[in-house]
Amino acid sequence: MAGIDYTERIPNNVALHENRRLQRALEDWQPKFLEWWHDMGPNGFQAKDVYLRTAVSVDAQGWAKFGYVKMPDYRWGIFLAEPEAGRQVNFGDHKGQPAWQEVPGEYRGTLRRLIVTQGDTEPASVEQQRHLGRTCPSLYDLRNLFQVNVEEGRPLWAMVYLRVAHFGRDGREESEALLQRRSGDSDKPRILGAFNEQTPDWLSYFMFCFFTDRDGKYQLASLAESGFDPLSRTCRFMLTEEAHHLFVGETGIMRIVQRACELMREHKTDDVRKYGGIDLPTIQRYLNFHCSVSLDLFGSEISTNAANFYTTGLKGRFEETKKQDDHQLKAATYQVAELDGDGIVMREEPALVSLNERLRDDYVADCARGVARWNEVIRKHGIDFELTLPHRGFHRAIGVFAEARVSPDGRVISQAEWDARRGEWLPTEQDKAYVQSLMHAVTEPGKFASWIAPPARGINGQPIEFAYVRLG
């Protein structure tokens, strides 16, 4: 088991005390991070005791302990997965060479951009969600929100460590800039579009955890294949934490769907709004929105940047080492959806420039498995309704579909039809106002808002009625 040294000012398992220059630089950044957390972290709950898990090891088994912590006292630190003896670069032009412990000079700029972009997403989601605690549907959900928030703070530390340790002054300056950008700010926005969207309510939050955090899973898994070993080890541990965030999203939506179905059965109506529920068509519209903006996070379908990341050994495919090919792809092709007049066709493209689309395909297949579990809840209640993922061309702002109008079922349509039917497919102002009207805090242990069912079980073996956050 790889233990973490909590006697240090910055908890870590990288022997930080052996590099005084690096230690001083990170200790200089620490109060700036804490100032950002106080300013932009969860609003109104900084002094409350929250039942949180804290990493005590980087092993997959028994890696965390649970206990009450005030969020500003959470021990954020630098945790890398254990090194793999004899690890090699597993793809690209450097396949078979020993994995790099230092940044290759010729790839310095490219790798820095990758780390900057990934690191920018972590604080952005905290900023997007900072007001949600005031409208929590239960203490159970409030605790899960705060767990996600503090665990978005820790990968931020990991990316800052990589920048400062391996990129010198540039890395230090970028770490400062990271705390100056703000989600949705007109002057200093976050880098990626989805992280500038508002998260004003808990339906949006659960959709964000399911769709947008799942993009994070696939990006981290691709970076975990990197030939740059410190980045690989960082991302491998981050994936351990990411699983809970996806669980929060999937089970959150499932519980909203379950409650809608219960109200439909109880009152023999599809209109559950009059009974304080969120109707299934509204859930579908929110699903369409969050899925489409998350699909944009994978980038353009055809991308020379993605090809360069791969050939240089910096960013692989999802589960790269499990794939049965030459791991260089120079003669390989891959099917990509493209516009062809008024239709959409599949065309063979060089596999190297199609890597964004391949990762998007892996992501969509994973999303579909979660949606199938939601539909199973609907079927068990005997209700004739099915939630569906929209076509990948729907409501896109990046890539080949950015200039097109595509319906959720994959038809290329006119602007007039889009304008006429947009309210069927995406949340309307009335939808948003209704969902917002439901957002009232429920803080009695074991009680839940009218629009969401209780979970199947509590956290870490605790009962559902456990005081997950002490508000007194």
What are these regions (language model features)?
Residues 118-121, 202-216:
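Aromatic-rich carbohydrate-recognition surfaces in CAZymes
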Residues 132-187, 238-256:
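Long, hydrophobic, well-ordered secondary-structure blocks that form the structural core
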Residues 124, 211, 215, 229-244, ...:
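Short, well-structured alpha-helical interface segments that form or flank functional binding sites
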